UniProtKB/Swiss-Prot annotation:
<feature type="transmembrane region" description="Helical">
    <location>
        <begin position="366"/>
        <end position="386"/>
    </location>
</feature>
<feature type="transmembrane region" description="Helical">
    <location>
        <begin position="470"/>
        <end position="490"/>
    </location>
</feature>
<dbReference type="InterPro" id="IPR001036">
    <property type="entry name" value="Acrflvin-R"/>
</dbReference>
<keyword id="KW-0997">Cell inner membrane</keyword>
<feature type="transmembrane region" description="Helical">
    <location>
        <begin position="339"/>
        <end position="359"/>
    </location>
</feature>
<keyword id="KW-1133">Transmembrane helix</keyword>
<dbReference type="GO" id="GO:0015562">
    <property type="term" value="F:efflux transmembrane transporter activity"/>
</dbReference>
<keyword id="KW-0472">Membrane</keyword>
<feature type="transmembrane region" description="Helical">
    <location>
        <begin position="871"/>
        <end position="891"/>
    </location>
</feature>
<dbReference type="GO" id="GO:0005886">
    <property type="term" value="C:plasma membrane"/>
</dbReference>
<keyword id="KW-0813">Transport</keyword>
<feature type="transmembrane region" description="Helical">
    <location>
        <begin position="542"/>
        <end position="562"/>
    </location>
</feature>
<dbReference type="InterPro" id="IPR027463">
    <property type="entry name" value="AcrB_DN_DC_subdom"/>
</dbReference>
<feature type="transmembrane region" description="Helical">
    <location>
        <begin position="973"/>
        <end position="993"/>
    </location>
</feature>
<keyword id="KW-0614">Plasmid</keyword>
<keyword id="KW-1003">Cell membrane</keyword>
<feature type="transmembrane region" description="Helical">
    <location>
        <begin position="927"/>
        <end position="947"/>
    </location>
</feature>
Amino acid sequence: MSRFFIDRPIFAWVLAIVAMLAGALSLAKMPISQYPNIAAPAVSIQVSYPGASAQTVQDTVVQVIEQQLSGLDGFRYMSAESASDGSMTIIVTFEQGTDPDIAQVQVQNKLQLATPRLPEEVQRQGLRVVKYQMNFFLVMSLVDRSGKLDNFDLGNLIASQLQDPISRIPGVGDFQLFGSPYAMRIWLDPGKLNSYQLTPTDVASAIREQNVQVSSGQLGGLPTRSGVQLNATVLGKTRMTTPSQFDEILVKVNPDGSQVRVKDVGRAELGADSFAISAQYKDSPTASLALRLSTGGNLLETVDAVKKLMEQQKAYLPDGVEVIYPYDTTPVVEASIESVVHTIFEAVVLVFLVMYLFLQSFRATLIPTLAVPVVLLATFALLPYFGLNINVLTMYAMVLAIGLLVDDAIVVVENVERLMHDEGLSPLEATRKSMDQISGALVGIGMVLSAVFVPMAFFGGSAGIIYQQFAITIVVCMGLSILVALVFTPALCVTILKAPEGNSHHERKGFFGWFNRIFDRGTRRFERGVGAMLKGRGRYLLAFLLITGGTGYLFTQIPKAFLPNEDQGLMMIEVRTPANASAERTEGVLQEVRDYLANDEGALVEHFMTVNGFNFAGRGQNSGLVLITFKDWKERHGAGQDVFSIAQRANQHFAKIKDASVMAFVPPAILEMGNAMGFNLYLQDNLGLGHEALMAARNQFLQLASQNPKLQAVRPNGKDDEPQFQVNIDDEKARALQVSIASINETMSAAWGSMYVNDFIDRGRVKRVYVQGEDISRISPEDFDKWYVRNSLGQMVPFSAFATGEWVNGSPKLERYGGISSLNILGEPAPGYSTGDAMIAIAEIMQQLPAGIGLSYTGLSYEEIQTGDQAPLLYALTVLIVFLCLAALYESWSVPVSVIMVVPLGILGAVLATLWRDLTADVYFQVGLMTTVGLSAKNAILIVEFAKELYEKEGYPIVKAAIEAAKLRLRPILMTSLAFTFGVLPMAIASGAGAGSQHSIATGVVGGMITATVLAVFFVPLFYVVVVKLFEGLMKRKPNAVKEVTHEV
């Protein structure tokens, strides 16, 4: 094949240009994201039960739904939480590879079976099933600079004009409105109700009867008599639109003809649908829409679509209202991709300089350099066929591939130049002879290097997705690299290279002459060193065994983790005031946080928004959340300006706040996989010990964790039990007073909860009508005496006649995991420790908890455990596949052994470099380690292959063959190794977005390449001699053993 293109170089150029054009076109169309869909697909079920307690929601809604969620294909785990505001969320997580649309349909079908058993009020509110992602990817806020609109006005703007079109954008999965649409609020006065012998149920019934939309039909509608000349629509009663209309609703007509209207027992007001959540952008009231990405959604395209829509909608917003994005995850995506693109260009330049140093010819150096854009662009053309897009993982893989793909071109160029120098051939003749010699070796080395990464592509879970991005990209690059080396590079050699004027590199003068003389002296010393090692084989084999054992020990000392921490330019602060604290107290703490961010960190903070009434631990008046976006990484390059340092300073400052818990935390490296970095677990009541026992175990866990030096920021992701007022209905007294239990329950729900009645029309949009007691009538337990229920005789009976109250402890939020009562706990490893160390510490703590209390990890921690279980298999499988490929390549079982023995030498450097930089053994480290294994084997192949040829075909003594092979291959080994090392060096010293993952990959690779090169060139000849002698000795003994057995018989 190569000869065809050697004779037709323009044909080769045409193919290369077509490949690059195809790649460029594909590149323009490929979606861009920070990561592929690594997070497992999930579906959430959201339900509201107004006025119900957390326990009521759990007993009547959560467990009913959970019982039906069985038999789901690809089911992984399920979590549920119910809150004291009547809200409930169940999140069903599926295995990687499950189609999220099919998963959603399955959950909806199961939910249909549970719906008839749910309370009527829940069914009237509706059940929402959506594809779910844990973290927000964008928060869009409205701020009124004129000061005319408050939070609820802005919230209604979002709910009425923006929420629906935004939620329909492809990629938007779920949303959280930090604000509220308008609703018609009917505030009831219990004293006036009693004076007219009315109850809240009477008012609600009157509203249902009179606030209706009547379909009245037509005049002259078909069928009709012949001769009818008129057809017209009949308009009947329509739904009401204003508070004054609701005030005039007739509730009761007395026997004397007098009338009681809504305005006589209360008042109608255009208020908020919910008063639970309010937000501020810096010091301005705001309402916000926080968006979650749908499973499989493209982040950049979705955010771009949202912002384009908002640009269109700005013209329809009131004067003075601005659109702001206080929390946006796309800058880190763009910055990460931009950073990797810069790294690729830097890698190409560094590789070019290294090649130029060794090849010492601009023409010769240009040939491998030209191979880089051809291979990379052609790779972009093929990636979509494997389901891959442009993301930081595929880009990282291309950085690794640059050093690998130039290797093949270097081998071709170096061999052509050698033939021109040594045999005086023309470029055409040298290229033809060179390709005849090395075509098989190119394919063989490419096969071995590809074999290193192929096993990674078959692993499952989130780690498997990461492995696949690297494996497929690198294997595609390697395959294309071999094709380019066989097709394009020979054509370039013929057209670009010139026959040398002298006979040797060493005749050069200046810098290159000095370098060659130094290199020659080093080569002679190296040759003597190899000879000395081969004479003292026993000592150096013992040293190798010690190195291998030390490497194994050091490997166990690397802290384990799933992913490295990343500076995403984002931070969150969670605020918790004491149980039963009011929203006003929480707002005071949030104001302290706002002052700190504006004054102490103002130079680094771009946006911040506070939310009162909500955080990731749950809703409630004692909950608060702060979303913070920092300035660009280029403006935060100084010491202490990364998000981790900022979070540490913030926590030190907030620790001074005595009447609240304020915790700053950083999002995880992959935003879709959680809200905070660290570990995520559930304590489970496996034996049904009860809520109090579970809370006691949680408190014991938190106390032990606070004393453990490996753990920090360990906190419950829920709410502490709080005093709650329990109303006890005496059924006997109620029956004696002829009061129905249903009337009691309806009155309680309407008075202290919020009874949804029906809908009204507000400026062309349908909104809700609620009935509730005035705030002054539901402040303290004594206010129960203000409310009455009408008995069957028409008499008004006070609550005190049949009900008593008492204060009890109860939970404002209840959690379940896997259908078992559970409590969620979050935390982080202390500085100097990894999440793997933290999990070991947690296992020790669990041994001290009562029997029946179990532990389950979720989210990122679940993935980390799965990855840890896979890692040993990955390492073993990789080495085995490499060994088998080598055996097939050399048709020998002995030669591969001498190659595989070099692997620990590469791993040693990777381990030492990782420990030196205090990094972790995460997924990226494992990818780098596999790369090191492949490159170590490649270096060994270059020596072993040459030694085998000298020994078996040219009759060299084995020791001399090994020494000669090591000497002759030293220059190309150093050139290719240095080219690869300098190619990944920009990743090892990267800063800014994505620096953590780049460090994790490149540090191990750089360290591994240093030891794999420095030690391997000495040890590989030793391995080859020892292994060949050992196998030859075994083969000689086998015939003798057969003869002895035959003689005895």
